[in-house]
Amino acid sequence: MRALNSRLVLIDINSSWQASRRLISATATAFSSDSSSSFRRTRGARQRIASSKSPASSPSPVRRPSDGFSFDVRSPSSDSSISSRKSPTTAPPTVELDAFLEILPPATRKELVKHEAIEELIEVVMDLGRKPLARFPSGDWVISEQPVTHQDLELAVSKVGDFSDDNRSGIDRSLHRISAIRNRKLQVIGLTCRVGRVVSGSAEIIRDLIEGGGSILVIGSPGVGKTTLIREIARMLADEHRKRVVIVDTSNEIGGDGDVPHSGIGRARRMQVPNVNLQHDVMIEAVENHMPETIIIDEIGTELEALAASTIAQRGVQLVATAHGMTIDNIIKNPSLQILIGGIESVTLGDEEARKRKVQKTILERKGPPTFTCAVEMISRTECRVHQRLDVTVDAILAGKSAPFEIRQIRGEDDVPHKLVTPIPLENLEEEPAPLLNRDFVSELLSDDEDEDFLLIRSNKARSNTYTSPRSSPVHVYTYNVLEADLLQVAEVMGLDDEIEVTDDVGEADVILASSSELKQNSSIRRVAKLHKLPIFVIKSTTMAQMVKAVRMILGRESFGSAPKAIEKSSVDDIEIKDDAPESKPSLEELDALEEVRLAIEYIVIPGGEPVELLPRRSDIIVRQLELVESYQLAVENLGTHLNPRLQILPRRSTKKTLTSSSPQKSADGSMGTTGTRLPFLKD
C-alpha cells in the first residue's frame, strides 16, 4: 500500500497488470511505473538488467511472489481474489502474463496493457526496424508506431534463457516461448514471443480416446493449440489416471523453461533434449531407463523421430505426439512421416483379384500397422476431427474413398460449470453452399471418392419429385471430361437423341455426367450438385458399354425394351449400376468368354464394322454372352450346332428385346439372326 492523493490503494500483486486497468486514469498513471513485476532469470554470470529507466529514488520494495508462482485453475479455493474473478462457465487459463510482459520494452508494454483483449494475446512479434505487432484471435494489432531498435531486442534477450540450436528459448518456470531470427553474423534481428497457456479442460473433447489407452496423433497447423492439448493430456494421464508419464520436451514448450517443470503438466516427468537433432535418442532413452506407461512427444518432424516412435509403439508404450499438417492426407504424402501411418507401398494384383476389387492392377496399400491407433485433426482451438481408427482411415484414403471421421466441438453453456463436448453426427453436418461454378472453375475442383465402375449419387430435385422416360422435354445433361459428341452419338445410335440434350450451364442441367478419372480428392462438384439438387452419374471410362449404361440410367430405364422405370428423387439410397458380369461369382471360363465378347465388340465390330465369330462355348456361357451383346444393341447369329454352339456378332442394330440360342429367327434374306440397319460408328 502507498498513499496517492490522500487515498489508500490496495494492489493485487498476482494480477497487477489487470488491476491497474480498472483504476481511474490518474491513479493508473501514477502507479504504472511501480506496478510491473520483475521476473528475471539468472543463469551463470548473466546480470540483472533494469526493466525501465526509473530514478534512483524509488518507493520501498514490495514483496513479490517467487519466480515460479502461478495459480492453478483446478484449485479455485486457493486464492479468493482469483475465485471471485473466475467465470462460472469456464476455468480461466493459467497465464504468467506479468513475466511475459516484463521482457517487452517499457513503451511497448505500456501500450499493450491497454488493449481490451490482452487476456487473449497469442504472441508478440518484434522485428528490427519494424513496428511491433501483437497477434490476437481477432487479428494483428500494431502496438506502437515506433519501430523496434537493437536496444529493444537486447533488452528482451537479456531477460530470457539461452537459445538452443533451434533458436528457441523461454522464461524460467513459464510456458512462454521466445524464438529468434538471426542475420548472417548470428545477431538477433527479430523475436517471436508466444504466450504459453495451461487451459484446464481443453482435453475433455477427446477424453474417451485418452481413457481408451490407445496412441493418439494430433495433427494441425502451427498455432492451432496442439501443444496446449497434449500438455493437458499429460496432466490428465498423470494425475487422474495415475500413469507413469514421461514428456520428451525438445523445445521446453510443454513443461516450460528451466530445470523445474511447470505445474501445468501435473505429476508427469519431463526429459529435456540437449540437441534438437538427438530427439530420437532421448525418446528411446526414456523407454529404456524410466519405465514409462505413456510418452508425450511434441513435433515429430524427421524420419528418425518417426522410426523411434514406431519402435516405442511396438514396446507396448502409449504414445501421444503432434505433427505438422492439416489432415492425415498430408501425413501420407510426407515421405518422412509415412511410417507413422504404417508406410505406403505399391502392390501389383493378379487378374482375378483386380477384377474382384474392380481396380487397376497396380495400387497403393498400407505396408504395416500404423504407429498410432487414432488421430485428431485440430481445426481450431474449439473444434477437431476425430478418426477413431487410423488404419481404417488410411486404407479408405488410399482406396480413393471417403475416410470416416467425427467432428467434435466445445460449446459453453451458462448453467454448466465446465465446457461441454458435443460430438456432431456426420449425417447432420451441413455443407457450405458452393457458388455457381462455370466449366473452367469446376475443372479445378472436382474429386472422386468412389471406387465403383459406375455410381449414381442422387439428391432431391426441386422442380419435380420424379422424372421418367420418355419425357415431353429432353433431359439436359451437364458433362465434365466426357466428350459431348460421344454422348450425342451414342444417344443417336440408340435412337434416343431426341430425349437427351447437352448443356454448358449447371443451372439449366437436370443431371451431371462426369468421368471419375478427373474426380480426385475434392468434393466440390458434389456440393454444386447438392446446391442445384442434381443427380451425378460417374463413369470410370468413356467406353461404349459405359456410355450406353449412362444413357440408360439418365433416362431412367432399367434395360432396353422394358418399360421405363421412374427414379424416385425422394429416396435416400444411392442407385448403384450393376456390372455386366453375373451376380454370382463367375468362373475363369465365363470371364474369358465375356472378355472375348467385349474385346470383339469394342475393337472390331463397332470400329471396323466387321462381324466376329466367337469360340465355341457351353450353353450356359452362351447365354451370358448373349446378354452382354444385347447391352450393345448388336445382332448375333448362332453358327454352331446344338452340341457345340458358337456365336457370331454382326455390326447391325438388334431390334429384338431378347435373344436366345434356342430360338434363332431368320431375316428376310434367309440369314440367321435379327435384321437392322447399319449403325454409325463411334470415333476411336
Swiss-Prot record:
<protein>
    <recommendedName>
        <fullName>Protein SEEDLING PLASTID DEVELOPMENT 1</fullName>
    </recommendedName>
</protein>
<dbReference type="GO" id="GO:0010431">
    <property type="term" value="P:seed maturation"/>
</dbReference>
<feature type="region of interest" description="Disordered">
    <location>
        <begin position="651"/>
        <end position="684"/>
    </location>
</feature>
<dbReference type="GO" id="GO:0031972">
    <property type="term" value="C:chloroplast intermembrane space"/>
</dbReference>
<feature type="binding site">
    <location>
        <begin position="220"/>
        <end position="227"/>
    </location>
    <ligand>
        <name>ATP</name>
    </ligand>
</feature>
<dbReference type="InterPro" id="IPR003593">
    <property type="entry name" value="AAA+_ATPase"/>
</dbReference>
<dbReference type="GO" id="GO:0031969">
    <property type="term" value="C:chloroplast membrane"/>
</dbReference>
<comment type="function">
    <text>Required during eoplast (a highly reduced plastid type present during the degreening and dehydration stages of seed maturation) development in embryos and early stages of eoplast redifferentiation during seedling growth.</text>
</comment>
<keyword id="KW-0547">Nucleotide-binding</keyword>
<keyword id="KW-0150">Chloroplast</keyword>
<keyword id="KW-0067">ATP-binding</keyword>
<feature type="compositionally biased region" description="Low complexity">
    <location>
        <begin position="50"/>
        <end position="88"/>
    </location>
</feature>
<comment type="similarity">
    <text>Belongs to the ycf45 family.</text>
</comment>
<keyword id="KW-0809">Transit peptide</keyword>
<dbReference type="GO" id="GO:0009941">
    <property type="term" value="C:chloroplast envelope"/>
</dbReference>
<feature type="region of interest" description="Disordered">
    <location>
        <begin position="33"/>
        <end position="91"/>
    </location>
</feature>
<dbReference type="InterPro" id="IPR045735">
    <property type="entry name" value="Spore_III_AA_AAA+_ATPase"/>
</dbReference>
<dbReference type="GO" id="GO:0090677">
    <property type="term" value="P:reversible differentiation"/>
</dbReference>
<keyword id="KW-0934">Plastid</keyword>
<dbReference type="GO" id="GO:0016887">
    <property type="term" value="F:ATP hydrolysis activity"/>
</dbReference>
<keyword id="KW-0217">Developmental protein</keyword>
<dbReference type="GO" id="GO:0005524">
    <property type="term" value="F:ATP binding"/>
</dbReference>
<feature type="compositionally biased region" description="Low complexity">
    <location>
        <begin position="657"/>
        <end position="667"/>
    </location>
</feature>
<feature type="transit peptide" description="Chloroplast">
    <location>
        <begin position="1"/>
        <end position="78"/>
    </location>
</feature>
<keyword id="KW-0472">Membrane</keyword>
<dbReference type="InterPro" id="IPR027417">
    <property type="entry name" value="P-loop_NTPase"/>
</dbReference>
<dbReference type="GO" id="GO:0009507">
    <property type="term" value="C:chloroplast"/>
</dbReference>
<dbReference type="GO" id="GO:0009657">
    <property type="term" value="P:plastid organization"/>
</dbReference>
<dbReference type="InterPro" id="IPR034081">
    <property type="entry name" value="R3H_AAA"/>
</dbReference>
<dbReference type="Pfam" id="PF19568">
    <property type="entry name" value="Spore_III_AA"/>
</dbReference>
